[in-house]
Each structure stands twice: as C-alpha cells, then as structure tokens.
C-alpha cells in the first residue's frame, strides 16, 4: 500500500489515489497476467504502441493476433485472451472436418471433436494469451488442406481445382511459421505427404505412355505452383509479420533496414534456445509427455487455510494414455501387418496421421534445452485421431462393439469434470486439490503446494 504522505499537498500525488475502486482487492488470473502472458500479452501492447519489443524469441504473428483483442477491448485480461479463445473454439470445427475427411463417418468426427474439447490441456492452452493456440490452429488447417489435396484424383481433376486446397495449405503453412517456428516441423510432414502422393501416382502411370506424359505435365505445373505458395508467399507473410518491428525501428535515429532487421532477428532466435541452460520445476522430457507425468503449473494462489485456486496445464489421462496406446497399435497395424481387411482409404488416412505425428513430435527428441508437456500440444490432436482410426478398424471388423467409443467419451467427460477446478482456477477445497494430486492419476499438478 502507498503511504498517505505521498499524496499530501501535491496534485501529482493525489492523482495516484483518486481511483481506488479500480484496484483489485486481491490479484489473480482474473485481473492480471499469468505464466507466459507476461511475455506475449505485454509484447502485443508494445506492438500497438510502437514500443521496444520485449518478447522476440518467436515470430510476431501470434502476438499481432493477441494485439487485435487489445485494440478492441483494451489492455485487460479479456482483451488479451479473447482472440486465443476464439481460435481455440474455431479449432473444433476444423478438427471435425479433418476427422470426417479421414474417417468418412460423422459419428467418429463428432467423437474426435468432442474428445479434443474435453482435453484439459486444450482447455487451458486456449484460455491463455500465448502463441501456442495459433500454431496448432494453422497446423490443423495445413493437414486438412493437404488431406483434401491427396484425396483428389490427381490425373482426372482440373489443375485449377487441385490447386485450391494446395494453395490454402501453403498459406496456412506461412501463417503457422509466422506464429511459431514449430510450423516448420509440420511443414516437413507436409512435404513427405506431398512427395509420397506424387511418387505413388507416378508409379501408377509408368506403364501408360499417355498417362505418363500427362503426369509430368501436371507435375511440372504443380511444382511451379508450390514454389509460389510454399516458398514465396510464406516468406512474404513472414516478412510482413515484422511490421511492428519496422514501425519501432523507424522511430530511431539510426534504425536498421527492414531486411537487415528481419535477418538479425532470425539469427537471435536461432541462437536463443541452444544457449538457454536454465532448468525449471515443471520441465519434462519428450518421452514423458504422452503419459502426463508432469504438468505445467500456470498459476496457484492459496485462499486461506482450506481453499486454493490453481491452473495446471496437463493432458487428461483418459485421453492421452488411451490415445498413445491406440496410436502405437495403429502404427503396428498400418506398417507391419499389411492385411487385406483395411481399405485403401483407411491405409491412406493412417499414413497421413502417422506422418503428422512423427513430424510434430520427433524433432523434440533433438532439442537440448529444457522442455515442457505443453510442447506435445501440437501433436496430441493427431494422436487422438490415430487412436480413433484404429478404433474404427476394430469396430468395422467386428472386434469391438460400437459402444466402446461412447464409453470412452463418457469417461473423458467425467475426467474433465473432475479436473475442471485444477484447469480453470476455480477455487476448490484444499482437500479436493490433495485428492487430485495424490489419488487421481493426473501426474504432478501442484508440486506439493497442497
């Protein structure tokens, strides 16, 4: 509290105390920043007011999107969180559409979207003003559009029609990389999907001279199109995302040119993670993530002796554990068993998902710095889709009942309800927090604080 003597006899001092009703009685996540909001939401404000930028370790687009909420609603929690929340909500119909393309069944697409909505990490990550929600949204769009492209008849559809999903995929790739560099991991997966599809199509045409000639005509046109939409346009999007940096640099007497500035930023970003040697209580290794052993503790406040408020970002064991096992079984089925029971479409969907999982997950095995469970956030949606695809195979072959998927959904919903206080910051009895920490198999949520 400010001593009253500060305000005595001075107009400036009195101005410090003339709006006491605007000061919150107790600081909390409802009236202030928590976790990485102190970097990303702050930087959004700095972008808006052409100030020196505090957070530069990720590309700017995600923070520009956060800034839009601040422009509309002010520099307050709702302002900096509304756009990430909207992207989190918009993610669900995108995910539903992708699942429907892969499974060709509306009930399984609904199951996929419902499970994603009930994942506690999806819930926490889409309620906070950080850039992770944006990169996942754009990755889902990338895979959706590439799936649309792969499922079209390359030799029969007009090139203009083929180019629509391919161009949308390239733009989504550019938006993703301009939000976070992990979009490059997903981009590598897109390249594998694309070239595998082209090679398979070329092999199918090799014995027909006319078909082979048409294949190469289409392929050269497609390669030229991809150079524009997967190289030139993403590079332009990335460059334009640095406009807030350019605006601030223009206010300096000896500002750096725009291209030189972008190159300097990339060098600094590239050297930042390898040079980072810090450790963290919540850090976890990549092989621990699917099994939710160690949450990322966003927020905690003790509300007297008997109540606490906490936000822990962790996956739901009812989803992550089951999905991890299902994805492994799918990989075994798709890569090693090679039976004739599965349709060509089912196998194609399996390969798309396995490539997406590998592209988004395996690069983390090479990262030397400390990592966290939320780095699995961009991989998990494809893991749950893989598990559902394996369940579809089991169900349609008569090996399991169609009721299994609804039982799984019910268990996931029950787990979400149990975990809701720990994922949302809702005040809860300390005894209940101890139940979550020590009885329910959720991993470490509060790290002994309860």
Q: Where in the sequence are the language-model features?
A:
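Transmembrane helical bundles and short interhelical boundary loops of multi-pass, membrane-embedded
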Residues: 1-20, 26-29, 161, 165-168, ...
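Extracytoplasmic catalytic/substrate-binding loops of multi-pass membrane glycan-assembly enzymes
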Residues: 2-41, 53-65, 75-78, 256-257
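Loop-to-helix entry region of an early transmembrane alpha helix in multi-pass inner-membrane enzymes
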Residues: 56-66, 73-93, 110-113, 125, ...
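Transmembrane-helix motifs of polytopic, lipid-linked glycan transferases
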Residues: 82-103, 141-145
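Short acidic/glycine- and proline-prone juxtamembrane loop motifs at membrane-interface regions
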Residues: 84, 121-134, 179-182
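Transmembrane-helix signature of polytopic, membrane-embedded enzymes
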Residues: 95-118, 136-137, 154-164
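Membrane-interface transmembrane helices that cradle and orient dolichyl/undecaprenyl
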Residues: 100, 142-165, 195-205
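Short helix- or helix-capping micro-motifs
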Residues: 112-117, 124, 144, 173, ...
């Amino acid at each position: 509290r400010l001593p009253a003597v500060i305000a005595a006899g001075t107009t400036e001092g009195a101005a410090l105390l003339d709006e006491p009703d605007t000061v919150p009685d107790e600081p909390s996540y409802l009236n202030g920043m928590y976790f990485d909001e102190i970097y990303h939401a702050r930087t959004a404000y700095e972008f808006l007011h052409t100030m020196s930028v505090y957070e530069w370790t990720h590309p700017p687009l995600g923070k520009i999107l956060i800034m839009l909420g601040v422009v509309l609603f002010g520099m307050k929690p709702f302002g900096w969180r509304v756009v990430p929340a909207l992207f989190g909500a918009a993610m669900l119909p995108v995910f539903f559409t992708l699942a429907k393309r892969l499974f060709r069944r509306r009930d399984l697409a609904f199951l996929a979207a419902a499970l994603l909505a009930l994942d506690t990490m999806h819930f926490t990550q889409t309620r906070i003003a950080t850039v992770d929600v944006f990169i996942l949204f754009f990755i889902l769009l990338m895979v959706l559009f590439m799936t649309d492209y792969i499922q079209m008849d390359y030799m029969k559809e007009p090139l203009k029609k083929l180019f629509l999903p391919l161009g949308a995929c390239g733009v989504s790739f550019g938006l993703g990389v301009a939000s976070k560099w992990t979009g490059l991991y997903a981009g590598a997966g897109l390249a594998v999907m694309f070239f595998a599809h082209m090679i398979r199509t070329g092999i199918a045409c090799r014995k027909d001279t006319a078909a082979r000639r048409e294949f190469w005509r289409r392929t050269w046109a497609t390669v030229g199109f991809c150079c524009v939409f997967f190289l030139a346009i993403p590079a332009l999007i990335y460059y334009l995302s640095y406009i807030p940096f350019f605006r601030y640099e223009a206010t300096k007497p000896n500002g750096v040119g725009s291209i030189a500035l972008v190159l300097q930023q990339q060098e600094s970003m590239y050297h930042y993670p390898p040079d980072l040697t810090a450790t963290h209580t919540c850090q976890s290794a990549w092989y621990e993530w699917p099994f939710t052993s160690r949450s990322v503790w966003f927020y905690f406040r003790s509300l007297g002796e008997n109540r606490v408020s906490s936000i822990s970002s962790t996956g739901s064991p009812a989803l992550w554990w089951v999905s991890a096992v299902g994805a492994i079984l799918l990989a075994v089925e798709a890569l090693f068993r090679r039976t004739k029971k599965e349709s060509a479409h089912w196998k194609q969907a399996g390969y798309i998902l396995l490539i997406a999982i590998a592209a988004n997950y395996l690069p983390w095995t090479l990262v030397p710095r400390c990592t966290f469970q939320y780095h699995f956030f961009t991989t998990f949606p494809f893991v749950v889709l893989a598990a559902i695809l394996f369940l579809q195979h089991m169900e349609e072959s008569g090996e399991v009942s169609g009721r299994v998927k609804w039982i799984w959904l019910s268990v996931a919903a029950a787990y979400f309800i149990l975990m809701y206080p720990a994922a949302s910051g809702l005040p809860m009895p300390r005894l209940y927090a101890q139940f979550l920490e020590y009885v329910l198999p959720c991993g470490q949520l509060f790290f002994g604080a309860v």
